[in-house]
């Protein structure tokens, strides 16, 4: 096992905990209205925390020479890239974070499921989620759909969103994505966002459709991503 793999494995729990605290801090800064003394005290604490984090920059998977990558490090790079992703990364304080899994829908069809709860720091319209954030979550969840049919690496050719009603904050949201059509290198997937209703049911707040294009094998050769990064 490489030194990098050992180091990142050892720091992961602390990194996840730190990101949770920063995420909560962002929500508190957005929510609270303290006096100037409290603001100055908080600023000093944050400045001290930033000073404590002074260290060399973390290398991304694409910055690591192939000659340095063994099997253990490849696994670690994959995990590390996921940990820092914009929407589902547990170590990225900007991530909600989104929890992604696979399952089946009511018809028994395979789906990618994204579960998330958005607080007031993600607000767009009054007491509702920002539409751009909803679109970004759709993009992330839909990116898993090609793997349901073993389509291999793909790139997004088009993403369209239809907003049916405002998406509420501070509730458990569920995103579902499925493949609806595949022809040659092209694949179409659709998704929906479900929010709970007061009567115990759910309603669709937005829908999305994405066109993916498979990457030709010749384009993959010599450019494999050891971390499966998006």
Stretch-by-stretch model annotation:
Residues 141-174:
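Hydrophobic beta-strand-centered segment that forms part of the acyl-chain substrate-binding groove
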Residues 103-107, 132-151:
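Active-site helix/loop of acyl-thioester processing domains in fatty-acid/polyketide metabolism
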Residues 2-70, 74, 167-169, 180-230:
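HotDog/MaoC-like acyl-thioester-processing domains
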Residues 39-121:
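Long amphipathic N-terminal alpha/beta scaffold segment
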Residues 109-113, 158, 172-174, 186-188, ...:
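Intrinsic-disorder/low-complexity, polar/charged segments enriched in Ser/Thr/Lys/Arg/Asp/Glu/Gln
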Residues 115-117, 160-162, 176-178, 192, ...:
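Residue-level recognition of well-ordered beta-strand positions that form the cores
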Residues 118-132:
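Short histidine-centered catalytic/ligand-binding loop motif
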């Amino acid at each position: 096992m490489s030194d990098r793999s050992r180091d990142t494995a050892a720091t992961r729990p602390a990194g996840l905990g730190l990101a949770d605290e920063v995420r909560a801090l962002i929500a508190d800064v957005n929510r609270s209205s303290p006096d100037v003394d409290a603001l100055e005290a908080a600023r000093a604490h944050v400045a001290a925390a930033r000073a404590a984090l002074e260290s060399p920059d973390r290398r991304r998977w694409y910055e690591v020479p192939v000659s340095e990558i063994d099997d253990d490090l490849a696994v670690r790079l994959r995990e590390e890239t996921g940990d820092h992703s914009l929407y589902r990364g547990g170590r990225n304080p900007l991530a909600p974070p989104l929890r992604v899994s696979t399952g089946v829908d009511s018809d028994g069809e395979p789906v990618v499921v994204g579960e998330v709860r958005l607080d007031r720091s993600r607000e767009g319209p009054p007491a509702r989620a920002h539409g751009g954030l909803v679109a970004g979550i759709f993009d992330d969840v839909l990116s898993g759909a090609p793997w349901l049919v073993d389509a291999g690496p793909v790139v997004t050719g088009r993403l369209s969103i239809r907003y049916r009603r405002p998406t509420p904050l501070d509730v458990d949201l569920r995103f579902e994505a499925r493949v609806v059509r595949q022809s040659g290198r092209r694949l179409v997937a659709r998704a929906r966002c479900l929010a709970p209703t007061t009567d115990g049911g759910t309603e669709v707040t937005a829908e999305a459709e994405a066109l993916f294009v498979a990457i030709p094998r010749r384009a993959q050769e010599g450019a494999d991503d050891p971390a499966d990064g998006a």
